Amino acid sequence: MSRINLLLLCGGGSAEHDISLMSANYFESSLAKSDQFSVLRVELDKLGQYRTAAGDECELTNNREIRFRDETKAPWPVDYVIPCIHGYPGETGDIQSYFNLIQLPYFGCESEASSNCFNKITAKMWFSALGIPNTPYIFLHQYDDEAISQAQTALANWGSIFIKAASQGSSVGCYKVDDSSKVAQVLKDAFGYAPYVVVEKTIKARELEVAVYEYNGEIVATLPGEIICDTNTFYTFDEKYAKSSKARTDVVAKDVSVELSEQIRAYAIKAFKGMKLRHLSRIDFFLTAENEILLNEINTFPGSTPISMFPKMLQNHGHDFTEYLSLVINNQLSAKD
């Protein structure tokens, strides 16, 4: 049996570029445990330039091959691609649209599902349409006096708010605001990251995460894990990835009843099916002191860094990451044939 030429595409040039490289390390080491794959790792920078790990400039052509700038190097045909790119253009659906155009099979959610989940406004509309509870919010489409007034009214009504760029990940462009005098500047900062902004009511709650993925034709939802931050903090970009972070994670959340755990998992599977996700996702929830469950967000290409929850929860559920990748890829390529 010939080996599968697998393109591991990483980076992307967004604010999450370096995190994507860390996740790619995990994918690369996992794929190396199987003799089924011949892996070429290529980094995409913010200028749209492709480079191999060896530094060779190249491009992914519509003939489904990597063509090198050094013409003495033979083109490398691509059978399959893993777009290990957090944020733009990986989780936004953009690069998946290109793969669809050139008919290149790829790992992860398809373009429309990726786009719907990445945009916080679209996602919340989907959550509500599916009957899944989520945090109260308003959305703003431009930075002006009216937007500032709406955000200040929301703060007055809710006591504390989050102002979030609608299309960013890893808490980029996300700010907790308790002081009305800071609303205008924070709103301006958020609009610097995206053309739309979401203002959400601050929810004092536990932050629970569920890994939801396809395994041998079944949609699997793990037991909820938990992100635990210092009191009065939230899981910022720095809290996620800085060495000084005091946040910790429990692969299985403690003191969550079986009934609540099963309801969270049911909501997660409902979201996965309803939004037509594919292969993998991490679905995040709030659990309040009153045991109210609120869907927070869906990550269509969850991080796979040393501190990331998705691979830990998958492994805790009894599945091996390399075997999982092999099953998904082989099933997909077999269906294509």
From Swiss-Prot:
UniProt catalytic activity: 2 D-alanine + ATP = D-alanyl-D-alanine + ADP + phosphate + H(+)
Cofactor or coenzyme needed: Mg(2+); Mn(2+)
Positions annotated to bind ATP: 154-209
Binding site for Mg(2+) 1: D284, E297
GO cellular component: cytosol
Compartment annotation: Cytoplasm
Residue intervals of the ATP-grasp domain: 124-330
Pfam families per UniProt: Dala_Dala_lig_C (PF07478), Dala_Dala_lig_N (PF01820)
EC supergroup of this enzyme: ligase
Pathway membership: Cell wall biogenesis; peptidoglycan biosynthesis
Keyword Protein biosynthesis: no
Residues that coordinate or bind Mg(2+) 2: E297, N299
EC number(s) recorded for this UniProt protein: 6.3.2.4
Manner of cofactor binding, per the entry note: Binds 2 magnesium or manganese ions per subunit.
Molecular function as annotated in GO: ATP binding; D-alanine-D-alanine ligase activity; metal ion binding
Keywords for this protein: ATP-binding, Cell shape, Cell wall biogenesis/degradation, Cytoplasm, Ligase, Magnesium, Manganese, Metal-binding, Nucleotide-binding, Peptidoglycan synthesis
Database matches in SUPFAM superfamilies: Glutathione synthetase ATP-binding domain-like (SSF56059), PreATP-grasp domain (SSF52440)
One GO biological process term: regulation of cell shape
NCBIfam families: D_ala_D_alaTIGR (TIGR01205), PRK01966.1-3 (NF002527), PRK01966.1-4 (NF002528)
Family affiliation: Belongs to the D-alanine--D-alanine ligase family.
Role description: Cell wall formation.
Protein name: D-alanine--D-alanine ligase
